[in-house]
A protein has these predicted regions:
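Bacterial N-terminal signal peptides that target proteins for export
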Residues: 1-11
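C-terminal motif of bacterial Sec signal peptides marking the signal peptidase cleavage site
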Residues: 18-22
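Bacterial signal peptide processing site
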Residues: 24-27
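Long, folded non-catalytic interaction modules
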Residues: 33-164, 169
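Secretory pathway targeting signatures of secreted, lumenal, and periplasmic proteins
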Residues: 41-43, 59-68, 208-282
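Signature of long, low-cysteine stretches enriched in small and polar/charged residues
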Residues: 93-149, 155, 277-341
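Short, well-ordered beta-strand elements
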Residues: 144-153, 249-256, 342-352
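Surface-exposed amphipathic alpha-helical segments
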Residues: 156-182, 342-378
């Protein structure tokens, strides 16, 4: 079986097309970072865009339904905001990637230095002769992510941001995901981990998740299902849930033999998801079950890198209860090929939080998916 070649989708590769210098943690004692997850401080002097720059922005089509941003763009900060605060894809309500706060360079002081995520945009022809991007962790606090864009002209910055801004945003997202996975290392469900390790896998499922269904080890162990769950004979499933508080979070890991060359297509993976979750998740109305929303917001698939260099297929979409009550929410899945055992492995998280914002909860659960290790990762 040929190994799937990793498609370098990683945002870091995108950013590295411009000179980038990464700064390591100095090891010194640092204060705790301030601010909440997925908040970012933008430090820059806001300037009006020229007509040529406005034309370039219009050509890029940053402001439209597909881009997830609808506010007018007339200044350099507007341009940054159009990318950093664009709406996340496949969410039931509009929620931005990041909540932003902007201050001018002269107002950045010791009070603001511990901020969790900081993006500097410094445009100065007297200091710089070429555009550079520098990233660092834990400059003034911990955990902290800092990105500096240094440009000799506004024109060069605008051109760079239009091409690479999404890569900068993805770098900040990745920093948040990494912080969350570090937290999970100290708090894991040992029983779930033992079940996965028996299959040659590993995953940091938090200890506040309970096991609902396990067919990974053969047979079926059901813990707390309202209705019986069934799975295909060649499919193995581990289903865990955190139902504490007003929000429910679920993790489902399932695997099946790799026999179809069309496996890693959106059509195949979506059909496989429906086949699995419709048998697992039922509503309170007899005959109701979980399905995927295709009409209002079709699932979106892309290739990502996990475990440093392994290829995974990410799908974001909306789930809903079919033939039952009005229930639904967002989900994210990662699918990979287990080369050692010749199986396809999918790890998915879906959440239910009626009337609540879901970005942070989904991102926290999504971080669990990034901890999945297959035999070839070890």
């Amino acid at each position: 079986m040929k190994r799937i070649h990793a498609f370098l989708f990683s945002s870091l590769v995108v950013i590295l097309s411009i000179v980038m210098v990464g700064c390591k943690d100095t090891g010194k004692t640092l204060t705790s970072a301030t601010g909440s997850i997925y908040e970012c401080l933008v430090v820059m002097n806001n300037q009006a865009l020229t007509q040529d720059e406005l034309n370039a922005v219009a050509h890029k089509s940053l402001v439209n339904e597909a881009s997830g941003y609808s506010e007018p763009i007339s200044t350099t900060y507007d341009l940054v905001k159009a990318v950093m605060a664009a709406d996340m894809p496949a969410m039931p309500q509009m929620e931005p990637y990041f909540k932003l706060t902007q201050v001018n360079m002269t107002y950045f002081d010791d009070i603001l230095k511990p901020t969790r995520n900081i993006l500097f945009v410094d445009i100065d022809p007297n200091k710089y002769t070429q555009l550079k991007v520098k990233v660092a962790n834990n400059n003034w606090s911990k955990p902290q992510a800092v990105c500096r864009i240094q440009s000799p002209s506004q024109e060069e910055f605008v051109a760079y941001w239009l091409e690479k801004g999404e890569g900068i945003r993805e770098w900040f997202v990745n920093q948040e995901l990494k912080r969350q996975t570090q937290f999970y290392k100290a708090s894991t469900n040992k029983d779930a981990r033992t079940i996965l390790q028996a299959q040659g896998y590993d995953m940091l499922i938090p200890e506040d998740y309970i096991i609902i269904l396990d067919t990974l080890l053969g047979g079926a162990t059901t813990y707390s299902l309202r209705q019986p769950a069934t799975v295909a004979s060649n499919t193995r499933v581990l289903w865990c849930c955190n139902n504490k508080g007003p929000m429910r979070r679920d993790i489902v890991i399932y695997s099946y033999p790799y026999t179809n060359p069309k496996t890693f297509t959106a059509e195949f993976l979506n059909e496989k998801r429906d086949a699995v979750v419709s048998r697992l998740v039922h509503g309170s109305v007899d005959g109701s079950f979980m399905g995927t929303e295709y009409k209002v917001m079709p699932p979106q698939m892309r290739t990502i890198l996990v475990q440093d260099s392994a290829q995974a297929y990410e799908i974001r979409g909306l789930w809903r209860i079919q033939h039952g009550e009005a229930m639904g929410g967002p989900y994210v899945s990662h699918t990979r090929l287990d080369h050692v055992n010749g199986r396809v492995v999918t790890a998915e998280t879906f959440i239910y939080a009626a009337g609540q914002k879901k970005r942070n909860a989904l991102r926290q659960a999504e971080a669990i998916l990034y901890t999945l290790q297959l035999p070839e990762d070890k």
